[in-house]
Every structure is written in C-alpha cells, then in structure tokens.
C-alpha cells in the first residue's frame, strides 16, 4: 500500500499543548517544554483512503518564530520527523515546514524519498476557487504574494485564462503585461476578488478591500490585519472536500479541527504527498521557489480522480 508522511508544526501554544495531549507529554501540554527536543516530535494521526493509500501526520511542536529563527534546528527536527514516520514513499510539508530551509530543498537532500511542499496543490486550489467565484471579464483579480512560488503560478495561470490582473510584484507584472504596484492598497483597488497567496499574512488593511469583495486566502495568519468589513467574504483558499472513503479516526478528526480543516474538508497541501504516492511519481509536484504549471495540472488531475474537489468554504478572519 502506498504510504506518505505529512509534517506540521505548532501554530501557537494551544497547538503545542494539543501535541502534548496526543503524545502524553505533560511538559508540552502545560507549556513547561518548548518543543525543541527531538523527543518531543510525535505521531498526530493516521489518515487513509482504504485500499488506495495510507498516510501519517507527524507533529513538530516548534512555534512559527522557532521555525524561522533557527532554520538549521528546524531542518534537523524535520529529518527526525521523517525518521519517525517510518516506511513512506513521499513527504509533504505543512505551514512553515514548506518555507524554511530552502522551501524543502535542504530536507530533500537529507532523506531518501521525494519531498513536496504543497505549493502546486495550493496554487491549483486557489485558481479553482477564483474560477468558481468570478468569470474572466467580470473584473480584475488582485494577487497579493505574487512574487512567491504559489502567487506566481496563480497569476500566470489566471492570465492564460483571460483574467485581468493586479499584482504586488512589479517584475512579474511586467512579464505578464499587467498592472503591478508595491502599494497593496493600489493593487486591490477595484478588485472584486483578491487572492492572498503569501505564506504569511497581516499585510493588508481590511478597509482597502472593495465593498462586497471576496478574499480567497491561504496566508497564516490571514492576509488582512483584521476582520473583514460587512459584505466582504473570506474563503479558505486551500479547502478541499473529502472523498466519501476518507478515514481519519478519532485523532484524525481532532487534527482536522485544530489544523483549521473542519470536519468536512482537508487542505490541499496535505493531499499533495498523497497524490504523489498514488500516481507513483518519482519527482515532487513542488520543491524550492518555483511551481511549474504542468505539475500543478498533474496534481489537479490526480486529486480530482480521487474525488477531492475545491470547496467554497467561507471562514472567519484568523489573526495571531
């Protein structure tokens, strides 16, 4: 049976405490320990599509600031997490695991199986959300975070599909012959749809959004610095509906909720290593700073064949 691992880290003290509950580690639960010891890493849950694929989620109880401030330590903990996962054919990366240490490249050099960052799946889900929200010609789409791997792939694909774009990357805007500006307020002005494609948020005032605008967001925390104004909508840009055969058990259900998935959906980045092992690809869908559109499309084909689909999921603002 194909098997994958998905690595995550604690997004805050509550998540670190939850990892302590799952691993029966009172030091983490009561916040005596900071999650920096390799022995604090633990299995969070098992996931599966019976008869098709098995997966294991491994929790690294380092907070975002810990991941960013000491990336060599973060890399070593990710290596330990892969070792804990056991026999797997691919490794996926969640949140800042996909950003630190060369966006997966340093980890790929240290382990013997493909490492995929989730960027192709995230980009695919964002594009599908835009397509279900706005038709080409109905107004411009703003892409915040267009200089990053996900934002660039989204912008290039939307341009191919005929959407008018406004980007926060002047360089990419020039190459696509579209509007670009460093001022985020200028970028989102007049846009009925805004894509928040950066890995981290807290960069845009909610007052800058047009009345009735839809923010399709994947940033953690949210792209905006506060809750959206009345009439505006935020969609979870990575949310995918689960196939009927998806199995997760008790701890998998707990993980779904604490990770922000909810009971009825998963995030696309988790599905990326799943699709990788099911398709028996030897190369990742995404690694490093670039997402190839062909790889994004290949992920979409596999995910769709397994009954994963984009779910238009309104969510509340999630700040720090």
Language model: regions and residue ranges:
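Short, aromatic/basic amphipathic alpha-helical patches
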Residues: 103-112, 175-179, 226-230
């Amino acid at each position: 049976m194909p098997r994958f691992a998905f690595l995550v880290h604690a997004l805050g003290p509550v998540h670190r405490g939850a990892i302590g509950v799952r691993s029966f580690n009172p030091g983490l639960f009561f916040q005596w320990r900071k999650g920096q010891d390799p022995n604090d890493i633990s299995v969070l849950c098992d996931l599966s599509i019976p008869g098709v694929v098995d997966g294991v989620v491994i929790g690294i109880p380092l907070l975002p600031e810990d991941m960013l401030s000491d990336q060599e330590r973060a890399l070593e903990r990710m290596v330990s997490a892969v070792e804990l996962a056991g026999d797997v054919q691919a490794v996926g990366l969640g949140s800042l695991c996909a950003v630190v240490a060369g966006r997966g490249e340093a980890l790929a050099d240290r382990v013997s199986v493909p490492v995929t960052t989730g960027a192709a799946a995230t980009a695919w889900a964002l594009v599908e959300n835009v397509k279900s929200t706005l038709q080409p010609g109905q107004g411009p789409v703003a892409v915040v975070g267009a200089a990053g791997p996900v934002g660039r792939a989204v912008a290039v694909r939307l341009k191919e599909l005929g959407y008018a774009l406004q980007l926060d990357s002047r360089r990419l805007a020039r190459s696509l012959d579209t509007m670009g500006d460093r001022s985020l307020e200028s970028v989102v002005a007049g846009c009925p749809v805004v894509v928040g494609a950066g890995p981290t948020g807290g960069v845009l005032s909610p007052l800058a959004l047009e009345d009735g605008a839809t923010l399709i967001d994947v940033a953690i925390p949210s792209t905006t610095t506060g809750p959206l104004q009345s009439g505006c909508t935020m969609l979870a840009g990575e949310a995918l509906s689960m196939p009927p055969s998806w199995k997760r058990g008790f701890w998998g259900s707990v993980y779904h909720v604490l990770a922000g998935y909810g009971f009825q959906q998963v995030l696309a980045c988790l599905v990326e290593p799943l699709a990788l092992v099911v398709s028996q690809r030897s190369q990742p869908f995404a690694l490093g700073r670039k997402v190839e559109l062909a790889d994004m499309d290949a992920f979409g084909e596999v995910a769709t064949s397994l009954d994963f689909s984009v779910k238009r999921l309104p969510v509340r603002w999630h700040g720090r």
